[in-house]
Curated annotation (Swiss-Prot):
Described function: The normal physiological role of the enzyme is unknown, but it is not essential for the viability of yeast cells. Has aminopeptidase activity, shortening substrate peptides sequentially by 1 amino acid. Has bleomycin hydrolase activity, which can protect the cell from the toxic effects of bleomycin. Has homocysteine-thiolactonase activity, protecting the cell against homocysteine toxicity. Acts as a repressor in the GAL4 regulatory system, but this does not require either the peptidase or nucleic acid-binding activities.
Database matches in InterPro entries: Papain-like_cys_pep_sf (IPR038765), Pept_cys_AS (IPR000169), Peptidase_C1B (IPR004134)
Taxonomy, superkingdom: Eukaryota
Gene Ontology process terms (BP): homocysteine catabolic process; proteolysis; response to toxic substance
Protein encoded by which gene: LAP3
Secretion signal span: none
Classification lineage: Eukaryota, Fungi, Dikarya, Ascomycota, Saccharomycotina
Protein name per UniProt: Cysteine proteinase 1, mitochondrial
GO MF assignments: cysteine-type aminopeptidase activity; cysteine-type endopeptidase activity; DNA binding
Transit peptide, start-end: 1-30
Propeptide: 483
Keyword Hydrolase assigned: yes
Family: Belongs to the peptidase C1 family.
UniProt keywords, alphabetically: Cytoplasm, DNA-binding, Hydrolase, Mitochondrion, Protease, Thiol protease, Transit peptide
EC nos: 3.4.22.40
Length: 483
């Protein structure tokens, strides 16, 4: 029977106190410190196991990746025959070097196929550095905007701490690429190439820029807390900060030689050794020669944590103020695979995001989840894809390009894919990799296709205006490619 009147208050206080202590009591019962005596017991047990003895002898004397590589499996999967490929060879092999610009390389490598075909070129690259310059400038400003919009949150909140952790990392998403191209266009790499200590090795530059942005964040948050700080003061501060950011950037990189609407002149020699001259603006070059219509690409992901057929938005992730948000449509793996085949059949390469370098042999250029014989040493992996994402074991880390696949005649699904990476010709086989279907299902997360390549029921998810997206926080693994 519950206590009444006078004793009820005392009872409730006692009950609440018990609830507060209960978790600590339970945790204490479940805690387990290392028992030294068990260490000897475990060691005797393992040393009596001949398989363990063999494994430890090998692993203490040889590199684990070399020792456990299943060469029989490797030979079987290293098949470079593909019955569905894009018709234009993508040359030369690109190299992002010591930078996190994979998304810019994958996206520009996709579009350069159109330029190669349109202008009858043997080799061509779009300027990744041109986009990189403006991405840094825009990201810095985007960061300042996020600091202002989160000023009501405590400095120790997860959001503010996440923002401060890496204000202008090199990474990005395809929608962020589109934001840049819509505003700044594209130019040939001949007009604006990489620099050895900024674009190709960005760590120091990022460090100095990050330090200055954190200083600016404190200034803005302090000003916003003062009652006297009206909107005009904040705007003035931000303009001063934008100027200083641009000054810092100009120390590390040349200012792009042409404005988005300014005409440039580019001379080139085609496959037939004929000389041509093009006069174009960056914005015109993107549409006329790279054939990019920014309104058509859409992103699809496979994230088994969430229902399929639903839109997923990554909150606060972006680079250009007023640009498009990062939004995906979540679908099953079979749908992703079929869309890849359809796009390749339309002679278009596929931008995709994966967890790299999981189960990737960089020497031979093979991506396969059974490439290393971990079960031979008793190391068995049991987590499913959804659990790996939830427990931070798997996330989207790298963007590459699918330029071909081998389709099974019976299932009409790919058996393997031809992947173009951006780590130079010494990675893989001349820069190319083979990715198995099982790898695609387990470690591929995103593909980009044109909306007109989708079935009507999927395309309508993007166009109907009736779909309310699932909103994930900026630190979610599905946004990790932008780190």
């Amino acid at each position: 029977m519950l206590p009444t009147s006078v004793s009820r208050s005392l009872y409730l206080k006692t009950f609440r106190s018990h609830l507060l202590r209960a978790p600590q009591i339970v945790l204490k019962r479940m805690s387990s410190s290392i028992d030294i005596s068990k260490i000897n017991s475990w060691n005797k047990e393992f040393q009596s196991d001949l398989t363990h003895q063999l494994a430890t002898t090998v692993l203490k004397n040889y590199n684990a990746d070399d020792a456990l590589l299943n060469k029989t499996r490797l030979q079987k999967q290293d098949n470079r025959v593909f019955n569905t490929v894009v018709s234009t060879d993508s040359t030369p092999v690109t190299n992002q070097k010591s930078s996190g610009r994979c998304w810019l390389f994958a996206a520009t490598n996709q579009l350069r196929l159109n330029v190669l075909s349109e202008l009858n070129l043997k080799e061509f690259e779009l300027s990744q550095a041109y986009l990189f310059f403006y991405d840094k400038l825009e990201k810095a400003n985007y960061f300042l905007d996020q600091i202002v919009s989160s000023a009501d949150q405590d400095i120790d909140s997860r959001l503010v701490q996440y923002l401060l952790a890496a204000p202008t990392e090199d990474g990005g998403q395809y929608s962020m690429f589109l934001n840049l191209v819509k505003k700044y266009g594209l130019i040939p790499k001949d007009l604006y190439g990489d620099l050895p200590y900024s674009t190709t090795a960005s760590r120091k530059w990022n460090s100095l820029l990050t330090t200055k942005l954190r200083e600016f964040a404190e200034t803005l948050r302090t000003a916003l807390k003062e009652r006297s700080a009206d909107d005009s003061i904040i705007v003035t501060l931000r303009e001063q900060m934008q100027r200083e950011i641009f000054r810092l950037m100009s120390l590390f990189m040349d200012i792009p030689p042409v404005q988005p609407n300014e005409q440039f002149t580019w001379e080139y020699v085609d496959k037939d050794k004929k000389i041509h001259t093009i006069k174009s603006t960056p914005l015109e070059f993107a549409s006329k020669y790279a054939k990019l219509d920014p309104s058509t690409p859409v992103s699809l992901i496979n994230d088994p944590r969430h229902p399929y057929g639903k839109l997923i938005k990554i909150d606060r992730l972006g680079n250009v103020l007023g640009g498009d948000a990062v939004i995906y449509l979540n679908v099953d793996n079979e749908t992703l695979s079929k869309l890849v085949v359809k796009r390749l059949q339309n002679n278009k390469a596929v931008f995709f995001g994966s967890h790299t370098p999981k189960f990737m042999d960089k020497t031979t250029g093979v991506m396969d989840i059974e490439l290393w014989n971990y079960p031979a040493i008793g190391y068995n992996l049991r987590q499913q894809k959804a659990s790996r994402i939830r427990y931070h074991e798997s996330l989207m880390t790298h963007a590459m390009l699918i330029t071909g696949c081998h389709v099974d005649e019976t299932s009409k699904l790919p058996l393997r894919y031809r992947v173009e990476n951006s780590w130079g010709k010494d990675s893989g086989k001349d820069g190319l990799y083979v990715m198995t279907q099982k790898y695609f299902e387990e470690y591929c997360f995103q593909i980009v296709v044109d909306i007109n390549e989708l079935p009507k029921e999927l395309a309508s998810k993007f166009t109907s205006g009736k779909e309310e997206p699932i909103v994930l926080p900026i630190w979610d693994p599905m946004g990790a490619l932008a780190k």
